[in-house]
Amino acid sequence: MLPNNQWQIPINNGLTHQENMAAHAAVMKLRVHDLQSIISQLSLRKPRPQKSEHQKVVVESLRDPHHARQIYQMASNFPNGNYEMQKRPATTSQVRSHPYVLPSRSGASNHLVNHHYQQQQQQQPQPHNLLHQQMMASHHSHLQQQHHPSTVRWLTPELLEEQLRGSMRYGAPAAAAATNAPLHSSFPNHGRSSQQSLQKSEKSNRPKKMYADNFEPLPLPFYDVISVLLKPVELHSSDSPTLKQTKQLQFPFLLTAEHISKISYRADVTPLPRYELQLRFFNLTEPVQGPQKDDFPLNCYARVDDSVVQLPNVIPTNKTNAEPKRPSRPVNITSNMNRYKKEHTVAVEWLADKRVWAAGVYFVHRVNSDILFKRLNQNVSRHRSLEVTKQEVIKKLSGGEDDIAMDRLNISLLDPLCKTRMTTPSRCQDCTHLQCFDLLSYLMMNEKKPTWQCPVCSSNCPYDRLIVDDYFLDMLAKVDKNTTEVELKEDGSYDVIKEEAFCISDDDDDDVVPATVNGTASCSSTNGNGLANEAAKKKPADDDIITLSDDDDEELNRGIMNSLNDSFSPGRHTASAELAAQKTPPQQKKKTKDDDIEIITLDDTPPRPVAASANLPMRQMSQQNQMPVGSSPSGMASTQMGMNEGASKTIRDALNKIGEQSANSSTQSSPLVQLHHTTHPLNFAQSSYMNPSSGSQTPTSQYGYSPMINQAPHFQMQNGLIGRNNQMVHMQQHHLQQQQQQQQSPQIMSPSFYAQQQMSNGGAFAYYPPQYPQQQYRQN
């Protein structure tokens, strides 16, 4: 598109300079369909659908001498959008026979006049109609003398009434008497309805104001208004008070070169602060005292230079038939406009009802929370002095005018928004509480979602009403960094409140260790005299500490497993016995004079005979698995507890000698145990946990056999002899050997308690103390 100043250069297109300027101005005023008709008639190149592209094609064609004259004539003949229109030649079908055939903007008014005229023709005689024809002829001649013959004006109701009265003055003398009568007297049947229709038509055709009444928009802290590009224009209400209508309006505005240079950036990557173009809507239905906040019309839709503006999303609601509402915030239209163009247009479409709205465009400078924080913190007038707040504290705690005094007033030093320690305590001037909040946190929260509500009392807390309290600012500088709460006094001073926190340990120490916060022990009380600490130190440890431990049992089991592998190693018996003797069952700790803690070991497992079990041969270990009928594991455990170390050593020596004698008369490596073949009143039975059908077991098992036994031996009983295969030993010889052992060392248990037992899994023998009844069973 060529600007106007370039048409001052002489162009050789066959038109004068004035004609070129007139043609250019006429083209710029044409509508899109008029431009399209010129392009189609002259067969010009087809432009893009934008109006600016159509204008560009037509203006460029003015340089062509073949099209310049035609474009000038066609553009000049098109209407320019004003209230004047070109008069077309009337045809015979358009000639009216009554005197009220004047064009009107409203088709309803013409129809109403025609209707009244038809009824008048039916009631009045024909000569009266001739009189009206004469009046019509004289009226047309009078209009042709006053107005330009090529145009007529659109009539308003006032002009229509004036012309009707004038037509009567130019008529017959009989009609002159009607000039003093009211207008509706000519229509006796429908005079009232005609007057009401004219009043409605006058009201609907009355020109409406473009700009809204003066009001004060709500100032936005994060937007500094530089200039007003479009003064708030009025979005009119619906013509019918009960019906809603969809309306559209377009408003032009201009940008200067300075504005264009400041917004020539990419809005998505440019950080704050930056310049923006802002579109705002307001509700002007009811007069509101104070600034007007942003409010969007119903079903609002906006476009800037044919680009759709993204409005804030509708707030979701669960209420039925609720009117959709949008958040109260401005709209950034910087990215919706051509930044290198001066003339712009805003088009707004909305659903009009009885409410009145307004829309305006502003050029603003957008800032962030850090800039607002510096502005308020550096402004001395926005700081409340220490003495003013101190007097307010004294007034609240002493009762003041209300005679209601508080016992104490605790103030938290933590920000109610972030739950962290405040750095710049601030509050609203209109709030009555003394509790403050952090200024920077409050500004950052409202930058993301502008609500401007006090975090303490939820009342309105705008930016221009915020203050910085120097009383609490001085308090934060003096108290410890770990302090989170203070108590205000009646004289305006304060005490630091520190919480008592102690850690209860499960150790045997009597000392109470205070809990630490960030490496510093907090053990002071509310009054600072330290009474709580002294009481905590003098508090005796009366609680019983119970220790549940299985470490000793694990060591015993480990010793037993080692003894199974070394049961026939004579050199290791002594070392195993010494090791097992050192590992005694856990005993109760002795109480000292300073120790009042009683240690209880909740271990219902009976202690085991460590020394005996650690050095018994494999077959003697298997003998312990035999239990008499009617016995229980608990009885077995108590019997083992009764065995002392001397008895265990005697039994071990006796069994070793029997094994050596059996080994001398046999080539087998496993010993044979000799027993009396006599009937004993005590019979033995197999333990329930011994499987008679099981074969040879691994040496690592508690009930296993020595590695020297490769196969399970088979025992036989013949004539008082017991042995494996043909290796038989007299029972009498075994009895003599047992008597010799009794004479050498004190014997607690008689060898007669070793009963004969034939087992299919290797011929193992079991030993039981004399207090248990023994029963002997022969296995099948």
Curated annotation (Swiss-Prot):
GO cellular component: chromatin; metaphase plate
Binding site for Zn(2+): 431, 433, 454, 457
Listed GO biological process terms: DNA damage response; DNA repair; embryo development ending in birth or egg hatching; meiotic metaphase I homologous chromosome alignment; negative regulation of mitotic DNA damage checkpoint; negative regulation of protein catabolic process; positive regulation of error-prone translesion synthesis; protein sumoylation
Effect of a null allele: RNAi-mediated knockdown abolishes metaphase and spindle midzone-specific smo-1 conjugation during the first embryonic mitotic division. RNAi-mediated knockdown disrupts the anchoring of telomeres to the nuclear envelope in embryos, but not in muscle nuclei. RNAi-mediated knockdown results in ectopic tbx-2 expression in seam cells, the gut and in the syncytial hypodermis. RNAi-mediated knockdown results in 19% embryonic arrest with 2% having extra intestinal cells, which increases to 82% and 77%, respectively in pie-1 mutant background.
Effect of residue 417 to A: Greatly reduces E3 ligase activity and decreases smo-1 chain formation
Positions with biased composition (Low complexity): 732-749
Keyword Zinc: yes
One Gene Ontology molecular-function label: RNA polymerase II-specific DNA-binding transcription factor binding
Superkingdom of this protein's organism: Eukaryota
InterPro entries registered for this protein in UniProt: PINIT (IPR023321), PINIT_sf (IPR038654), Znf_MIZ (IPR004181), Znf_RING/FYVE/PHD (IPR013083)
Pathway assignment: Protein modification; protein sumoylation
Any Pfam family: zf-MIZ
UniProt keyword list: DNA damage, DNA repair, Metal-binding, Transferase, Ubl conjugation pathway, Zinc, Zinc-finger
Domain (PINIT) ranges: 203-367
Family note: Belongs to the PIAS family.
Subunit architecture: May interact with gex-3.
PANTHER family tied to this protein: SUPPRESSOR OF VARIEGATION 2-10, ISOFORM I, ZINC FINGER MIZ DOMAIN-CONTAINING PROTEIN
Function of the molecule: Functions as an E3-type smo-1 ligase. Mediates smo-1 conjugation to air-2 in vitro and is required for proper chromosome alignment. In the early embryo, specifically suppresses checkpoint activation in response to DNA damage, maybe by promoting mus-101 sumoylation. In embryos, plays a role in determining telomere localization in the nucleus. Acts with pie-1 to promote piRNA-mediated silencing and fertility in the adult germline.
Name the record gives this protein: E3 SUMO-protein ligase gei-17
